[in-house]
Amino acid sequence: AYRLLSHRFQRSPHALSTQARFDALFAELGYDASFISTDYETGSAAALGNYIAQCLIDFGLQDGANEQGSYDNQYYDPVNPPLIPLLPGNPNISDLNRWQPLALDIFIDQSGNSLPSSAPAFLGPEWGRVIPFALATDDLTIYQRDGQDYWVYHDPGAPPHSDGPLAEDYKWGFALVAIWSSHLDPADSALVEISPATFGNFDIDQFPHTIEGLRDFYDLTEGGDPGGGRQTNPHTGQPYEKQWVPRGDYARVLAEFWADGPDSETPPGHWYTLLNYVNDHPAFTRRFAGKGALLDDLEWDIKAYFVLGGALHDAAVAAWGIKGWYDYIRPVSAIRAMADRGQSSDPNLASYAPDGIPLFPGFIEVVDADDPLAGTDSEEVGKIKLYAWRGPSFIDNPFDDIAGVGWILAADWWPYQRPSFVTPPFAGYISGHSTFSRAAAEVLTLLTGDEYFPGGLGEFHAPKDEFLVFEDGPSV
């Protein structure tokens, strides 16, 4: 583990301090870092460890990830010119169905690396070709674009296109994102009950099987899905305690907890955090699949980490293979581009365009002459406005300020993120978060023999005015 960790993190942010921690723990355990022999035939356990580490390192250098080339893309190129988020709109996009890079004054990536004056490249569009852990070739489709192969496991089919038979669903889906960004203000009166009594417990067999079915699954204006929760704790038989919180706090905490941005684990890392939470719970017993003899801590950790890692690796290969092939646009690009074109709901209203954004009263409207957003010379009249999170320009000090929600020009819409990151640098379809999370949740269920957290309840605390980093909060 020491050799592999030292190799894997040698180019990471704060690599020197990370290595110092590895060195300190290795020494504390009584091991000699200067012993580098791989001759395990001598019977040396340390040599065997070094040999296994070198095998893993060598395998990684030829597994298709292009580690030797700093994981750079070998043939993928974006079709769209970069969007400059600090400028209004999205005037230069050429294809509303394809991914668009962002041009940022400074980009701080998911690992905390600062890249000045950068348009970050698509992260992992060729990842479908990485050697998987357990994915089957029977589930593999190999596509070609520009003479290059794109490997796709478990192909879900194409997402809606702006100019295809599902154009209305394309518009609806991205409009939902804009509308749900209106839920990010703790000052509004909306409360949500977030205990297991209300959230979750939706049968996977009842998930929508069509794009059109999403309209019935998600609540467009209020947020949420049809999950019915559980009235009683399956371990104790007692009712779950209700937890009413401001919707704006819950939505912001949820967004930042799962954020792909700097100073955050990526979703696979979150699931290791959840596994550690389970491991450390006083009610948990280490029995593989919940049966048989108790395992010691080391055996359990090796098996659990190995199985979870394999599943998350395959989730990445599958999801990023899909992302690379379908190369789908992200919300900030689509929302701004549609709004630039106008509104697509009513040909009798101003700014009608068939490929514009749909109108939803109270959330997506047209600026009229009496609107505070009309401009000093009415230059914004006829443009699209959104009732949404107002964006980073309303935050001077993230420790004290809250951008809040209000009417803004759609040309200035931002997702809830920091301006040095904005949105993850890869295609929006298919969801990596969902793919990782479903895979990890199923694995934890199989590992522990229980689909619930120990004691039937898992808790995560987001302290008032401390947890959020994009802006101040949560408020309670």
State what each model feature region is.
Residues 1-476:
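Acidic/polar surface patches and capping/hinge elements
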